[in-house]
Amino acid sequence: MDDAVCTVGLYDASREHSACGVGFLTRKDSRQTHDVLLKGHEALCAVPHRGGMSSEGIGDGAGVSVDLSLSLFRRLTGAALEPGSFGVGNFFLPSDASQHDRASQLVAETLEEAGLRVLLMRDLPVDADDDLGPRAIKAQLPIRQWIFAAPEGLRDAALDSRIHGALLAIEAVAYTDAALDGLYPLSLSARMQVFKGRLNSWEIIPYFKDLSDPDHAVHTMYFHTRFSTNTDPHPSMAQPFRLMAHNGELNTDKKNRLSEAAIALARNKAIVRPRGQSDSCRLDQTLNARVFEEGLDLVTAVVAMMPPAWENDTRLSPRVRAMLEYFSLSEEKNDGPAALIFGDGTIIGARLDRLGLRPLRTVETADYLAVMSETGQIAFPPESVTRRGRVEAGGMIYWNHAEGRAYETEDALEQLAAKEDYAALLGAAQVNIDDLPSADSDLKLAAARYFGDLERPARYVAYTHNQESFKFLMDPMLQSGAEKVSAMGYGNAINALSDNEGGVAKYFSQRFAQVTNPPLDSIREADGMTLRVALGEKPHLGHSRSRQIVVNSPVLRMADMLKIKAQTETPWDRFDILYEPVFGDALANEAALISAIDAVANEVVGFAREKGGIA
């Protein structure tokens, strides 16, 4: 289903940016109590300013994710449930009420086919009183809940995988059948469940009666209150999602989507996305795939998808650097700004992306560990607080309930790096272009070497250089030896309104959410950003047929081009992108251009499938 967002005139919803509120609270002894929900409500009530609200008082969205309460679900089902022996699915029902029964049948049959025996189906009770307001009540979607038993002997990761398969089967129908528009799984898990809606932060706990039920005892809760960013406010795009909640924007989202689609195509699979999917929802969908389809543990997946700025950080140990560099060969970075809360019932944690432009404050007592957007969201008695702090750029903190201990950035990275011999994996997967043998004995000659048939003035024209290019850009740079810096706006005409297309270089631009973020000075930019690029087939799941070549910049020197042509580490090929225009007949010329583009695309795809490498 189309996931494009609305654009009207000059308005583009994908460029909306605001700040959300996120956080988690967990009992360090793993004991389930209702007090966690009461304290969570206190935290949510403290940040109404971090959630958007319409003029009619309707919230952009708020929600919570909690571990499955034994006391509540034992009472509801009348069964002697044990941790890991049952699961819960919460679903928004279709917008068309006449399709509710069909949607319920789809969910129930899919669960049964997966061997997940349904114990109880019910509509989640809500407190739709006058405090919420009639328009806000109308904006909510009904949630139907399924409680199911796990097959005998199927537990832990095997059960998670079975449930995830059922979830994908439901999504494949729900997101592609127009009649079921609106059917959306908030969560389907044997570990956690999600409650959310078009609510304000202070409304979420009172609205869902289960969350106010004294029998609803949990050990972990994480929450989100939303300023609608790159989608219109809608209950399904409220957060948390299934494994995470996210404050910020993902400026790499388009690149991430293209990369994931290409990988899925190479595996003869397809990614089915909900309509109007936000960047945060896409991140959660990818995180679920890494954990439940590729077998990564949650912390490894989070670090691989949102790595620290390791390239210029000399404080990292060699094995941590090797691990992060190995991850970078196959995983596209999800760069924010982004503050991420992640949890699966056993692990609950928080992470900042490499830029660190969103706040995450930590507080710890003898009983609780909490990480939230702001300090003081929960009024812990001062004498009970053992330490306070913050998560720094590229940093993280998480609590492992299986081990009963916290991990912070350094310990977490060292523990992950010790799981594999990443130095050996890295050596087998990549080679730096600087380590390749030189293909030309004279580097100065190589830099000036040209194999085309154009004279120098014609090459200037081909590269769209004119008198202004030399007068205002290149001549000052040649004289000073420094990059030309100016503060004027970019006033060049777009290609459609210009006879001078501008060449490939004109398409290089940086997408950055500068509306809500402070400027980065050159020192911090060097710490947090890199131009490093890996060329060649990604080593996904160990199936790569060749080593990648790592280059320090996407702009290659002629000496680099000669090295790539001479090397035998990875296949390469060149493709003719010229076509013969049809003058005097616009339609025929259009058809010829489309045919030429399709032919080049098919050649490149054929090369990638047969050999893989650099095209």
Segment roles from a protein language model:
Residues 597-614:
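Alpha/beta enzyme core
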